[in-house]
UniProtKB/Swiss-Prot annotation:
GO CC field: extracellular region
Disulfide bonds, paired cysteine numbers: 37-66, 49-79, 65-70
Superkingdom of the source species: Eukaryota
Keywords recorded for this protein, A-Z: Cleavage on pair of basic residues, Disulfide bond, Secreted, Signal
UniProt name for this protein: Probable insulin-like peptide gamma-type 1
Localization: Secreted
Alphabetical list of InterPro entries matching this protein: Insulin-like_sf, Insulin_CS
Family to which the UniProt record says this protein belongs: Belongs to the insulin family.
Signal peptide: 1-26
Major localisation: secreted
Matches recorded under SUPFAM superfamilies: Insulin-like
Single GO BP term: innate immune response
Length: 91
């Protein structure tokens, strides 16, 4: 009976370890893709805005556009916003 409990205990530990390993591998891959997307869109926005846009606003816009699609008009509108206007626009 004790070897049965020992085997069951080891099996449960292995299942828990496998579940944690699989859970941990999913998130970083998405974060890497999202970060790469934000960087590409931020660079494109910076060029489209002739390097005159507020960097925080452009970075936030890039992040939003990576999460859900946004139009070119929305992207270009971020060129003229400042950080304070962006925070009041969200309210």
């Amino acid at each position: 009976m004790s070897s049965y409990r020992q085997t069951l205990f080891i099996l449960i530990i292995l299942i828990v370890i496998i579940l944690f390993v699989n859970e941990g591998q999913g998130a970083p891959h998405h974060d890497k893709r999202h970060t790469a997307c934000v960087l590409k869109i931020f660079k494109a926005l910076n060029v489209m805005c002739n390097h005159e846009g507020d960097a925080d606003v452009l970075r936030r816009t890039a992040s939003d556009c990576c999460r859900e699609s946004c139009s070119l008009t929305e992207m270009l509108a971020s060129c003229t916003l400042t950080s304070s206007e962006e925070s009041t626009r969200d309210i």
